[in-house]
Amino acid sequence: MTNSDLQLLYSVMVDYYQCTFRLSVNRTRDITEKRAMFVAVARHYGVTYCAIAQFLCRKSHATVIHATKVMLGYMDVYPALKKQFNDIVDEFEFRKAVGLLAQ
């Protein structure tokens, strides 16, 4: 997954959640949950912890590792989060396919 793919994934999530969270240092659950979902989807596509941390302007890959573990645990408990994950993956795949067709 390239940096442009990460940017596309981020734009899908901004549209899905109707808010930005990339540069936010806000630590409320609402924002951290969105960042953790981004991390989980990016890891689903094999993006490295360091690449995700750099994209999100985080200082350490350890934050990304923690977010991954937390979100995977939440998705096991809350089916609504698993549905959000699947919706985001589907929309990302659609936009990526449409983008490739347009080229």
Which role fits each region the language model picked out?
Residues 51-56:
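Short alpha-helical "recognition helix" segments of helix-turn-helix
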Residues 2-3, 28-32, 78:
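Conserved phosphate/pyrophosphate-binding and hydrolysis machinery centered on Walker-type P-loop NTPases
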Residues 31-47:
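Short, amphipathic alpha-helical "recognition" segments used to contact nucleic acids or chromatin
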